[in-house]
Design a protein with these regions (language model features):
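N-terminal "domain-start" segment that seeds a small globular fold
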Residues: 20-41, 61
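Bacterial N-terminal signal peptides
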Residues: 7-18
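Thiol-based oxidoreductase modules, predominantly thioredoxin-like and allied folds used
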Residues: 77-94, 110-121
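Conserved helix-turn-beta segment immediately C-terminal to the redox Cys motif
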Residues: 46-47, 55-56, 60-84, 103-107
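Non-catalytic, surface beta->alpha helical segment in thiol-disulfide oxidoreductase systems
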Residues: 183-203
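Short loop/turn microsegments at loop-to-beta-strand junctions
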Residues: 25-26, 48, 170-172
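Thiol/selenol-based redox catalytic cores and closely related redox-interacting motifs
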Residues: 108-188
């Protein structure tokens, strides 16, 4: 048991050190759906939208909106990086292969899928630690049908939740410009039109 504690401590310190030492998003490497290491420096000069996704969520239909954006702007240097996450209501079950098949069949998704990650907590991806440090929580849209529901749910769990940068739910998105700056964060209640408006200023 003592050995496990030491291993956990070392891993935690390593993740913290990696995040602290990172000067740019291009300093990070991640695993893709085939468990191959991908350096985000491969995306230099591209505009990126990084999103944590789930296949059994009320926001899952956003896959279609994301694919529409991807098809519209990929030729202008736009990329979407899809990171499945099972932390919110266990709404991303199954293997990455199963997730990829689901997205392909139901939404004709062509943008790149990566390995499952955690976005909050002790085992969170260093990439998402970095993203959250650059763009905090933006607030749920009260005009969205799920906005008030999510707000009330979060307040019950933590009355001070809105002041924290943690990812609140599936389909939180981070927009990164061609120089690697994390310029915008979109909550799951933000519409595709809002994302597109910001995206067009960067292309």
């Amino acid at each position: 048991m003592e050995l496990l504690k030491k291993i956990f401590l070392v891993l935690t310190l390593f993740i913290s050190f990696e995040t602290m030492s990172a000067q740019s998003i291009y300093d990070f490497s991640v695993l893709d759906a085939k468990e191959q290491t991908v350096s985000l420096s491969d995306y230099k000069g591209k505009v990126m939208l990084i999103v944590n996704t789930a296949t059994r969520c009320g926001f899952t239909p956003q896959y279609k909106e994301l694919e529409d954006l991807y098809e519209k702007y990929v030729d202008k240097g736009f990329e979407i990086l899809d990171f499945p996450c099972n932390q919110f209501g266990q709404q991303a079950p199954g293997s990455v292969e199963e997730i990829k098949e689901f997205c392909s069949i139901n939404f004709k998704v062509r943008f790149k899928l990566f390995e499952k990650v955690e976005v909050n907590g002790d085992n969170e991806s260093p990439l998402f630690t970095f993203l959250k440090s650059k763009q905090g929580f933006q607030g749920f849209d009260p005009n969205h049908e799920l906005g008030t529901l999510l707000d009330n749910m979060m307040k019950k769990a933590d009355p001070d939740y809105a002041s924290k940068s943690s990812i609140k739910w599936n389909f939180t998105k981070f927009l990164v410009d061609r120089e690697g700056n994390v310029v915008k964060r979109f909550e799951p209640t933000d519409g595709a039109n809002k994302i597109e408006e910001a995206l067009k200023t960067l292309l």
